[in-house]
Amino acid sequence: VSMKQVGLNVASDPLMSAAYLGTKSGFVLICADDPGPHSSQTEQDSRLMAMFAKIPVLDPDSPRQAKEMMGMAYALSEAHQIPVMVRPTTRVCHSRQDVVAAEIPPGTSTADFKKDPARWAATPKFRYQLHLELEDKLAHIAAYPDSAPILRNPDATGRRVVVASGVAAA
């Protein structure tokens, strides 16, 4: 699913539920932010909306990294059954870069719906358990950057570190 930050406002209600309900397949939300704003009605930071919705966010610093992060986001979503946001900003969205396109394997999942009120019924009785499961998913996802080479700089040395994301990290 793709949208700009203003579209995320419209999609906020189903987004909040999607994290609790989880997904049965990979679900990547690309939400383009516009710091400034240069080409949007408002300036927003969708990372705050993702934090509120309790979903992970990947913040690419270039078109090439955005392409790489799409695969990471899909794998993360599949592994943890949760929506994952990729958040490029204006400078990434309005730039070009050569990337190597990979073959996309055909999907193998089938569309089926199994009645499961404990998962799909939006009632307080079931939501509490889903909340606990979501918090557990997020704890496991928090360890993910340690195993993702794209998110680390192996050439870094020294006793101090600057943590940055997106274009500021480039």
Where are these predicted regions, by residue range?
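Thiamine diphosphate
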Residues: 1-78
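Flexible, low-complexity linker and terminal segments
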Residues: 60-170
